[in-house]
Amino acid sequence: MSNLEQTLSIIKPDAVERNLTEEIKSILIKNKLEIKEIKKIHITKDEAAEFYKVHQTKPFYNDLCSYLSSGPIVVMILEGKNAVISYRKIMGSTDPKQAENNTIRKLYGLSIDKNSVHGSDSVDNAKSEINFFFKNLYT
């Protein structure tokens, strides 16, 4: 049985603004994650609120929604063996200061809020997050 999975990756506004998209993509490819779909978009605060609704009771929710909608983002569907776990390891800890060396967040994250990337935290969430940004892709 193959452990081929898909996961969602978002390159957040801070990294897009600093022109890090190609560098981050090369890290993904080097780590055997295939980019199946990619698009650069600018979402509204309402769309960010819908995407992050699982966090709506948390104190950082409004800031998170404002941040994700503050500039262009790059959303990607990644595919690979155990893609969800693999990508989470490549991303590193949410807080760049605590992230392991050579992870995306350690290399490029500015702060716990502006940590450059988002990745799905489970296979089920990956499916719903992919559907959020690529609604008509897999019907």
Where are these regions (language model features)?
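Non-catalytic terminal and connector segments of soluble metabolic enzymes
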Residues: 1-139
